[in-house]
Structure formats: C-alpha cells, structure tokens
Amino acid sequence: MSEEFGRIIEKGFETWKNNLNIALPFILDSLFSILFVGIVGVAVAFVIGFDTTAQFFDRLQIISMSEGQEMPAVEAVSLLLLIKPYVVHLILSFLIIIIGLFIIITFFEAGAIGMAKAATEKGGTGFADMMNYAKKHVISLLLTELLIGLFLLVGIVFLLPAALLSPELFSGQGGYGVGTLILGIFLWITYMVIVITVLFIAPYILVIESLHPIDAIKTGFGFFVSHKLDVILLLIFTVAIAIVSNLVIGSVPKVGGFISTFVSIIIVQPLTTLWWVRLYMAKTNKPLYVNELLSHPDDLSNEW
C-alpha cells in the first residue's frame, strides 16, 4: 500500500531532521560554482589585462550609480569600445562558465538524489553515498537534462507564425503580427510548463533506478500518467515553499538575501529532494525505512 501525499511530506520531513547532512551536496555545489566562476574570471582578467578589467568595472559602476541620462549613455559607449577587442574572449569565457556550472550542478544533483534515496531506504546517508551516486550517474543525468532542454526548445515552433509575419511587425500595420507573437509566446510558455511538470521527476528516477536517459524520461512520463495529482500537488507545494521563503526572508533589510540563500541551500533544497525521492519510492512500492521507535504500528504494513 503506497503512502498518501500528506504522509510523504511528513515522513520526508522526518528523514530530513535525521539526516541534515543531505544539505552537503547543495553547499558544495554553491562553493564549487563560486570558485569555478572566480577562477574563470581571474583567467579572463589575466588574458585581457588587469588594468582593462579594472576600467571595465569602474565604468560599469559609474553607469549603475549615475542618476542622469546623458552620463550613462556616454559611459555605455565607452564601455563597449573598451571591451570590443576582447569580445571573443568574453564569449568564450561565458560559454566555459555555462558548461562548467552545468557539470558542477548536475554532479551534485546526482549526489543529492543518491543521498536522499539512501536516507529514505536505509534511514541514514553520508558523503560516500553522495560521491558514489554522483560519479555513477553524472553523465547520464547530464544527457537527461539536455534532452529535456531540447524538448523545451521544440516549443519554439509556436513562434513560427509570428516569424512569418515579421515584416508586418515592423511596419505600420503590425497589429495582427504582434497579436500572433504574443499568442505564440503564451503557447510556448504553456508548453514549457507542461513539459517541466510531466518530466520533472525523470532525473530523480534516473538516479533511483540507475536508468539510461531515454528510459528515465519514458519512466518519468509513465509515472506522471499514473500519479498526475501527486506530482502536480508536490510541484505546487515545493514551488510555493521556495517562493514564500524567498519573499518573507528576503524582505529582511540588508541581510535578507543572504539568509534567504542560506535557508534555500540548507533546508528548502534538501527537503524538496527528499520529498520527490520519497514520492517515487512510495508510489512504486520501493522499500522504505521505518523507525520502529517512532512509527505507528500500521506504518510497518504501509511502508514495506
């Protein structure tokens, strides 16, 4: 007998309380991401020259702090002229940062899901679980995320009608074209929301079941079809928690942003991962850890 939604939330929270170290992958993710961006930034500054880099930030600060209209425009042109010889370097460094961050985030995401699985299944987890699952599944998880990204890009077809009417958009009679563009954007956003919702659990399934990317996506789709309400409820629930915590904590003067980030890394993200892992494991009748000292007698039959 699978757990009900409320029970999944309750038990997931209990698992988190007993395994606060599940925050480790998210902490390391943040630290390594910052370190990586810093290393690339220093490398770029070394290539283009530290004096040029200092001038870039000085002019950028002038633009951001100036209240007038004329000065920012002048400084903006000056800034563009300053970076023009280094456009290729900047584009290359940007691509390196994007690819590097994608790998770092995916590595620790696989580790976090693996830790959540171990904690849900055995009642405890540790650094070894994170490394084992991360090394084993990082490549497959990267490919899965890329495939889902491609599915999202397919929605660009909704903008094709507006593209065909592009001459009208820039003419004096572009009302119909603008309306088509707005409708296309709306349909694309709707399509992306649907794809994200349907395939949201696929990365978790890949790590839990040790599947290949295509199989993980197929299984994720099948799981959504069988458990639509639970998936949608958990998605709304976790997104609402993230938004509310950011709004409430982020509104604290001066330190709100820092505290909000800290809470997200230490509490919200680990809890969210545990809930999604437990949802799949509970609904597919996977073995779940039972704390016999704290659990109700009925839990033994419900969770095993």
PLM region spans:
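Membrane-embedded or membrane-proximal helical elements that form or frame transporter/channel pores
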Residues: 67-104
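Loop-to-transmembrane-helix entry motif
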Residues: 15-23, 27, 134-141, 145, ...
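Membrane-helix interface motif
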Residues: 43-55, 155-170
